[in-house]
Amino acid sequence: MAATPRFRDDASATPHPDGAPETAPSDRKHPVDETLPPLKMFTSGLQHVAAMYAGVVAPPMIVGPAVGLTPKETAFLMGASLFTAGIATLLQTLGFWRIGARLPFVNGVSFAGVTPMVAIGKDRGHDGIAVIFGAIIVASLLGFVLAPYFCKLVRFFPPVVTGTVITLIGVSLLPVAFNWSQGGNATAHDYGSTTNITMAAVTLVIVLGLRKLLRGFLQQIAILLGLIIGTLIAIPVGITDFGAIKNADAIGFPTPFHFGAPQFEIAAIVSMSIVMLVCMTESTADMLALGKIVDRPADERTIEGGLRADTLGSAISPLFNGFMCSAFAQNIGLVAMTKVRSRFVVAAGGGILILLGLVPVAASVIALVPLPVLGGAGIVLFGSVAASGIQTLAGAALEKGENALIVAAAVGVGLIPIAAPDFYHAFPKDLLVVLDSGISTGCVVAIVLNLAFNHLGRKPESEEAGTAPGGHDPVKAMEVAAH
């Protein structure tokens, strides 16, 4: 078997605040720490922004009208969300002290908080937004304090759990791509039209063709090129909207406390704290997935830093009129597909997000990409995440019946919110924050069943089906599974 390349891991070679580096520098810089030439850095970063843009602006588009904001105020929320997503992404990728995973990890507005935020602020106007922001600040600070303890969950993520969760992340995202392919707005007259679906299919074929025909850097930005070509084709078809450019302001700094000082209500704080715990669970799973994809397995310190960046970014976000931030799983698929592992590329994407938040007219250019075009590319992106999970499960000893049963039950439970969205409609609304997340429920089921089948009542063995190959260290487990 060929020798594994040895990289100099800058993240671990840099002295930590509490002592010497954990590992000695290797022969050459790890791809995660490589910097690309400026043009490649910019275009690769722009590709990440294009992949996440719709996901960032969608929550404010939903919450703004629900709480009674005007279209102009909702547009202001969208710009603020781009700005704060950029700040959170820079915290995550570049980091400082023990904050930041220092992985190619994109942060943006969390969808998990949309339903609770609508419930908190419905028809309350500026007061509703102020209460939402106050709840996010308190919940985020609580998450920041809990991060050093929450990261201990990594020990409960051997390959059978990790692979299951990564697969669920990809499968859970695919309905988003399907919705985009149909047009994104279920109430629109052309939702699900043959035109929209055909455009999605054309974009999908273009992306796959570019990946097959191109080489080198052009192959790495096949998604971006596919989005550009798809958008150009969509113009004569008539599904590209230029209205956003005409109405956009040239400059739009997100003035702090634009909607007034944050207000603090106990019920709202409890609700958003639950959302924060859900986001932290999903971010932990995302970091484990990304760590495997980029060949830098996420250990407890990495996850602690990542969770601190998530929660700090979320605490800062309301100051600039943004919402709770968390990892964007769709960008993990982009890393898996392009093989561009540099965290500085994603940091460049964070810089672009900040620029878009400050220059609304530039943001409106990105918004030109029709959702059907984005949906066609999304099928490949999100499918790549699921494929990475399946690859991880290949090293999880599924021939041992307990592990196959764990995967079957966890995937089955995790797919409930996707296959039957109203399945939990009779449950209390506070529980729906957790139950409506297939990633969270599937993750919990996988962890509990792994403990029940592979640990309780058994003597610890390094090669047990549910334990990590090579011991109970999940990082070593993923290394063994990968080779």
Residue ranges and their predicted role:
Residues 1-44, 242-257, 292-296, 306, ...:
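Intrinsically disordered, low-complexity non-transmembrane regions of multi-pass membrane transporters
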Residues 2-105, 112-124:
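N-terminal signal-anchor module of multipass membrane proteins
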Residues 18-19, 56-60, 64, 203-213, ...:
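Juxtamembrane interface elements at the cytosolic ends of transmembrane helices
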Residues 38, 64-102, 271-343:
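Membrane-embedded helical hairpins/re-entrant loop segments and their flanking transmembrane helices
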Residues 39-56, 192-204, 222, 236-237, ...:
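Hydrophobic, membrane-embedded alpha-helices of multi-pass small-molecule transporters
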Residues 76, 98-113, 155-163, 218-224, ...:
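Short, non-helical or kinked segments that cap or interrupt transmembrane helices
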